[in-house]
Amino acid sequence: MLDGGKINKYIAIENHPDDFILSSGMLFINNKPDTIITVFTGDKKDKRTRILCKDYNINHIELNLPNISIKDGINKLVDEDEKKLIETIKKFESFEKITQMGCGHPAHLWTSNIIQKNFNNVIFARDFPHSYKKKNKFECFSNNYINLISISNEKLFDEKINLFKKYYKTQRALLFFDKKYFDLKPSEEYYKINNNKKYFG
């Protein structure tokens, strides 16, 4: 588990290209994962995380599950998609695992629920910026989790945003539409499941 903001050997499961850097970029800067698994790419031409991993000599796996929007819900996903995610993660049994908690986007919640049901000792990062929007009621959502650590450093936050700008140029509109959340320069928060209140969505 996280010890002083570092993990010895871990994989990162991101929902979409950019989710790992946005939610865990400060961790990434000082502690690179062995592998990043990108779940929802939809378009196989999407090379954003692929290029990041190549530059930093990190293994990268793209599951190419269909992109789903908040409007779509999870109706596009089938049992084979769930099986594909589980079987891929099982290949890294000896590794620590980090993913997003699932607050604020149905795709994030779908992934989080499956990981909770099938794997132990997973670290969940607070979704940025989704979980900071009032309608997502993070305080209620987070009752199912126990906080492990927060990484707070304005300089590191700026560095992770520079990474975001460099590798995820097509997503830079977030810096405008969600500006007030970026201006907060919030800590990165990491949690584990509260086994007394296990949540499956």
Residue ranges of model-derived segments:
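Active-site beta-strand->loop->alpha-helix modules in alpha/beta enzyme cores, enriched
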Residues: 1-120
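The feature marks non-catalytic terminal segments
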Residues: 2, 48, 55-58, 72-77, ...
